[in-house]
Amino acid sequence: FFAAADAMIAYAEANNIKVIGHVLLWHEQTPDWVFLDDKGQTASKELVLSRLKNHINAVMGRYKGRIHGWDAVNEALNEDGTLRQSKWYKALGEDYIATVFELAHQADPKAQLYYNDFNLFKPEKRAGVLKLVAALKAKNAPIYGIGEQGHYSLDYPKLQDVEDSIVAFKNTGLKVVITELDISALPFPDPENIGADISLNMKLKQEFNPYADGLPKAVSDQLTQKYLQLFELFLRHSDAVERVTLWGVNDNQTWRNNWPMKG
């Protein structure tokens, strides 16, 4: 089960590369059995909490001292900034996020812990993160930084909106990490759902795949310019932005080739 991760971490250590863990808790891709008891009924809060603790201890314990930081909780907010009513929320209550940070810190006290989410350039969601961070800090939860996902396109978001979020998060006293940075050159088929909700699964329409034979130079230049503008922004706030993580080795292997429609 751990063979691939073991090999990647060994490679990183041999080449003096820091490793970031993703992710300890996420509402997506959690097996249904986690929330059921041995009779197939809704599991008790105590049972779900025990499973969560065992999971965190198993994963973080295996790599204790070897993984620099972890996305402790991923995408726990709705687009309006309210807490997502996920199975984790329903099983453990609204304090479950603080619990994850506490359990993770116990498992590896030296690991940096982040809250990670997408569309944080939107004012409503940004406000939700600020409210969440304030609540976590009030509970003395060991949160180190805020992960601002970067699933962008050529025409969104506005750079000013990204900068406003960086400044707002910096003012909390936490560090900012730019995570999952990729920029799509393709038109987005559903403007109302721009972001990174992996549950979107739309039927392929060729009008949204205009560059099947290769990216025209003019569009490639636009893509280059967008990356340049973003990195200039990150450098302006290098006192707070500690890391930028690119989401994929190259554009040919990006997850966005198969989301929100496969093609």
What kind of region is each of these model predictions?
Residues 2-16, 56-64, 102, 130-136, ...:
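Short amphipathic alpha-helices and their capping/turn segments at secondary-structure boundaries
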Residues 18-20, 67-71, 110-114, 142-147, ...:
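Structural preference for beta-strand elements that scaffold enzyme active sites
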Residues 2-3, 46, 50, 91-95, ...:
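Soluble non-cytosolic domains of exported or imported proteins
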Residues 3-120, 187:
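Substrate-binding cleft and catalytic face of glycoside hydrolase catalytic domains
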Residues 24-26, 72-75, 116-121, 148-153, ...:
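Active-site beta-loop-alpha junctions enriched in small/polar residues
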Residues 37-40, 131-132, 194-197, 202:
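Short, hinge-like loop/turn segments at secondary-structure boundaries
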Residues 33, 82-85, 122-139, 158-166:
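Distinct, well-ordered alpha-helical segments
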Residues 62, 71, 76-94, 99, ...:
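Aromatic-rich peripheral "rim/lid" segments of glycoside hydrolase catalytic domains that contact
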